[in-house]
Amino acid sequence: MPRALVTGAAQGLGSEIARRLTGLGYEVVVHGRDAARTEVALAAAPGAVGSVTGRLDSLASTRLLADDARGRGPYGVIIHNAALGPDEPRQVFTEDGLDRVLQVNVVAPYLLSALLNLPRRIVFVGSDAARAGRPLVDLEVPQPWDGHQVYADSKLLLTMLAFELAARHTDRPINIVHPGWVRTRMGGPRATLPLSDGADTPVWMATSDEAVARRGGQYVHKRRAEAAPPAAHDATLRAALVDRLADLTGEHLR
């Protein structure tokens, strides 16, 4: 079976995705942001073949993570699940001078995509909050800062990144999935979907041979392609975003 890398696999959706992939026979490598979380991720996915550890709110740490992950590949599937949620209480700037939500949710997936060998499939875990996002292609957050708005912004930018990568590699399924409002630590107890339902479409897009799962450049919910936010289809905006990310990281998408 193919090897799969799942970021943010210590809890919630990422943990369930990793567990289900191992159950399907995939050779899963799990990621946690520190040693303790990585151990939790391994325990939650019996049968995982390896792990990588690294913070995504640091360019240096993300580079080391990519080096480690590359040595544990190659991968047939990469699932970019790790993210900060909408309930961050205040704006935090990272050691790289970036808004922490944007760095974890957008810059880190870009850098990993630029540094890792391209797998056969990529699944980005997005959110329908992207529809309320602003295309902040310069990665500068207007004030006053609002956690829910910046989360929405980050998920729109991630959708744009997924569509740009898909446009560059039309020979493989590269997609973004909106899993729904899932009862996780991020989603909260009032969320409408159990964890198993939230993980269903990301896992299906990573593994299925059905037509939707074999196409790229889609915004997928409940195993169906839906209309993406308009900015995802704007090639000029997407180019501006990846140019900014390339300048920031010094790495270019293939």
Residue ranges with predicted function:
Residues P46-G47, D68-H80, P86-V92:
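A glycine-rich helix->loop->beta "capping" turn
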